[in-house]
Amino acid sequence: MKFDSLIIGGGVAGLSCAIRCAEAGMKTAVIAAGQSALHFSSGSIDFLSRLPNGQPVYHPMAAFNELQQQSPEHPYCKLGKRKVQEALDWYQEMIKARGIYLSSQEDEANHLRLTPMGTFRSTWLSQQTVHQFPLTNTAGELNHIALVTVDGFRDFQPKLAADNLSKLAQFKDVKITTAAVELPDFEEMQRNPCEFRSIDISRVLRDERKLHAFAKSMIQAVGKADLVVLPAVFGNGDGAATIKLLEGLTGFTICELPTMPPSLLGIRLEEAMKSHFKMLGGIILVGDEVQRGDIEDGELKRIFTRNHRDMPLIADNYLIATGSFFSRGMAAQRLSIDEPIFNLDTVAIPDRDQWYQPEFFASKAHPFLKMGVICNDQLQASANNQTIDNLFCAGALLAHYDPVFEGCGSGVAISTGFHVAEQMISKHTARQNQNNKERTIA
């Protein structure tokens, strides 16, 4: 099978690249081994929360010069400020077309999102159903917050969250209460409520009659509150509409927070991106895995997958965006770090004792998270120190940055995927123009 572009990996980086290529009319396919890390994600887009030295970032764009000084090999620095801004603007508009509205603070500063543990994480863009707490004066005008869960739901414990939230100095004058609301018609269900995950609850509450009953129970359980916080259990495609309806039924201001996996806020992004890609004519090879490829004369000629075996997949350009260790895009051996498909050149620390901090929850970053594939400024990979002209890298596979410590995972994934797509489009256009010119001469 022959394509203009083949994308290895179905996460944010891979799908961003694939969608942009498909928008340009390129024949594009995505090879996805399974569920992406979006199923474990908050559904917010982190741009840059901390600099490599640990300094918190208020305004990501304003921190670019300092980032360049501290980490010149950082993926953002390879792309440049303008390209990163262009990529994130494109992503906001693209995902908006699928009904998901991502926004930042009015001054485009970072904001805080509430976690299931009752702590805060800095991020840049959040979905319309997520309450944005400002970095300064975090509690704002809130006097009463109600943390509400579904009775028996294991993936959000509001009392634990309330205890942690009440310990924060900014919330010392804020009343924080908890409540549990029983699912409608619970006695008729055949399952124990402790077995229900967020997706199961979302299916129950799609029934409008049950949603009305749930709203009445919420009013009784909560009473009054300035902000009602619920776990994200309201559908992956229609969650925002359900929340809006629930606000109308209860009179509450309601926000969602991501649950323990599976995270519906993350799944919403994934399904929106996949449906958009398919609408553009893209192909997704689900449940398949690239096992090897043939590299000749500095080019990747073909790849072979588990399902297609001896039938190669061929493209003019390839992107590998298989993620880091969590997604098996990188493999850690006893004394080495490897990229397992093409054996690409990687950044590694020879002394294993230097891979990590002595404590897991350390104040400094774990060095192994900056290990990854070496790329040039065009994000082209290399093997045995030879650049592979038509093989690009994007996302968590890249070296020289720590998506967890720096809070920039989604931003790097989107911007590098977009940057690679723009180069693929440019090469594709040049090839078409050359072919047209040759036909004209002939």
From Swiss-Prot:
Keywords assigned by UniProt, alphabetized? Flavoprotein, FMN, Oxidoreductase
Q: Which cofactor does it need?
A: FMN
GO terms, biological process? glycerol catabolic process
Q: Name one Pfam family in it.
A: FAD_binding_2
Q: What is its EC number?
A: 1.1.5.3
The record, for InterPro entries, names:
FAD-dep_OxRdtase_2_FAD-bd (IPR003953), FAD/NAD-bd_sf (IPR036188), G3P_DH_GlpB_su (IPR009158)
Q: Which SUPFAM superfamilies match?
A: FAD/NAD(P)-binding domain
Question: Which Gene Ontology molecular-function terms are recorded?
Answer: glycerol-3-phosphate dehydrogenase (quinone) activity
Q: Which domain of life is it from?
A: Bacteria
Catalytic activity of the protein: a quinone + sn-glycerol 3-phosphate = dihydroxyacetone phosphate + a quinol
Instruction: Show the GO cellular component annotation of the record.
Output: glycerol-3-phosphate dehydrogenase (FAD) complex
Give the top-level enzyme category: oxidoreductase
Q: In which pathway does it act?
A: Polyol metabolism; glycerol degradation via glycerol kinase pathway; glycerone phosphate from sn-glycerol 3-phosphate (anaerobic route): step 1/1
Q: What does this protein do?
A: Conversion of glycerol 3-phosphate to dihydroxyacetone. Uses fumarate or nitrate as electron acceptor.
- Subunit notes for this chain? Composed of a catalytic GlpA/B dimer and of membrane bound GlpC.
Query: Which NCBIfam families does this entry report, sorted A to Z?
Result: glycerol3P_GlpB, PRK05329.1-1, PRK05329.1-2, PRK05329.1-3
HAMAP family referenced in this protein's UniProt entry, alphabetically: Glycerol3P_GlpB (MF_00753)
What family does the database annotate? Belongs to the anaerobic G-3-P dehydrogenase subunit B family.
Kindly provide the name given to this protein in its UniProt entry. Anaerobic glycerol-3-phosphate dehydrogenase subunit B
Record organism:
Photobacterium profundum (strain SS9)
